[in-house]
Regions:
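Short, well-ordered beta-strand micro-motif
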Residues: 11, 82-86, 104-107
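Conserved Nudix-box catalytic region and its N-terminal flanking loop in Nudix hydrolases
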Residues: 13-52
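Short, solvent-exposed loop/turn segments at secondary-structure junctions
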Residues: 28-29, 67-71
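A generic structural micro-feature
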Residues: 1-3, 73-79, 95-100
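Conserved N-terminal beta-strand and adjoining loop/helix that marks the start
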Residues: 1-18
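Nudix hydrolase/Nudix homology domain
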Residues: 27-29, 98-139
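A short coil-to-beta-strand element that immediately follows conserved catalytic motifs
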Residues: 57-65
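Active-site-adjacent beta-strand/loop module that shapes the phosphate/pyrophosphate-binding cleft
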Residues: 69-92, 119, 125-126
Length: 139
């Protein structure tokens, strides 16, 4: 079974709204993020994905959720890691128009309705905290 890591950004604006992206491949909504590429750290991948999908420069903070799932059909074991992310500016721009159809700032309640794969409210994730530390290369 192949291992896959996927990172997501929980970004909240000054009004308390969270940013969601509407994906073209499955016609669904998600937090900005995506697959960690070979050689990337989790933070590098998330910074890249947020820029590609939203045009925002991400300041990656603490981990707020780790989920996992297995797919026998795809023969993959996936770790989904959600980070709290801050940005200096809230003006968004889709750079990956073939992957992202729309960006939308929504209230937490509205976002919860669109994010059907989470069993908890984003409110819960906004208050979670687990420190992330990259230990770099160890010989």
């Amino acid at each position: 079974m192949k291992d896959l890591k996927v990172v997501y950004a929980l970004i909240q604006n000054e009004n308390g709204e969270v940013l969601l992206v509407h994906n073209t491949d499955d016609d669904g909504w998600s937090l900005p993020g995506g697959k960690v590429e070979y050689g990337e750290t989790l933070v590098e991948a998330l910074e890249r994905e947020v820029m590609e999908e939203t045009g925002l420069t991400a300041k990656v903070g603490d981990i707020v959720s780790i989920n996992e799932g297995k797919s026998t059909r795809m023969n993959v074991h996936t770790l989904f890691i959600m980070f709290k992310v801050t940005v200096d500016e809230y003006k968004t721009e889709i750079h990956m128009k073939d992957e992202i159809a729309e960006l939308r700032w929504l209230t937490v309640e509205e976002a919860d309705e669109k994010l059907v794969y989470y069993h908890h409210s984003l409110k819960e994730f906004l208050s979670n905290k687990a420190t992330y530390y990259n230990e770099g290369y160890v010989d």
